[in-house]
Design a protein with these regions (language model features):
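Multi-pass alpha-helical transmembrane bundles in non-GPCR membrane proteins
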Residues: 1-203
Length: 203
């Protein structure tokens, strides 16, 4: 349904399809990985599961910059975020767990919170109600990273551990960002309908 809202404009449709694909890719890789038992196939899926996080990070910002920004502010951030994603996936493939324990986590956070500048621009152009799902979705992802990094808390031993809480945080963050994107999937929001916005242009 998200992609369908972009019909009639090929640029919007492609950018929305990128986000939809990255979301489905992450959820699919994670599901298959957790269903497999120990072995080579599970090891391969673990690599794909972690690579999918980079793809989702870049895929999430793609429609926001493709639809809401123009010129330099559209293409440069997209080029940067996809370059970081490609770098992260490549390093993950080469160095495996030796890299991802700390450096990879840092890359995830940099990719996510690197979009804070864009969030502020959109906040000023429209208002807080427009960007709140983007902002709190980022908070949810960050909380998940902190939980999995600290390996704490364990709510119910063997049932609800930091790993399960990480997955909950990802679902919450993804849902918020999906709903945020749905706001403008059909085109640019009407600035005039948001009288408290300062109407700062990002062009």
């Amino acid at each position: 349904h998200l992609v369908c809202r972009g019909r009639g404009h090929w640029g919007r449709t492609i950018s929305l399809a990128v986000m939809a694909f990255s979301s489905v890719f992450l959820l699919s890789m994670s599901a298959v990985y957790h269903l497999l038992g120990p072995g080579t196939a599970r090891d391969v899926m673990r690599h794909l599961d972690l690579a999918a996080i980079f793809v989702l990070s870049a895929g999430t910002v793609t429609p926001a910059h493709a639809i809401l920004f123009r010129g330099f502010n559209r293409w440069v951030p997209l080029l940067l975020v996809w370059s970081v994603a490609a770098t992260g996936i490549s390093l993950r493939t080469i160095f495996s767990d030796r890299l991802m324990s700390g450096f990879g986590t840092g890359l995830f956070l940099v990719m996510g919170w690197g979009g804070l500048i864009s969030c502020i621009v959109l906040w000023r152009r429209y208002d807080y109600s427009f960007v709140k799902l983007l902002l709190w979705g980022g908070v949810a992802y960050t909380a998940g990273v902190v939980i999995i990094g600290l390996n704490w808390p364990t709510v119910i031993p063997g049932v609800v551990t930091p790993h399960e809480l990480w997955h909950v945080a990802v679902i919450v963050g993804l849902s918020m960002h999906w709903k945020f994107t749905f706001q403008f999937a059909g085109g640019l929001p009407d600035v005039e309908s948001r009288p408290q916005a300062s109407r700062v242009q990002a062009d």
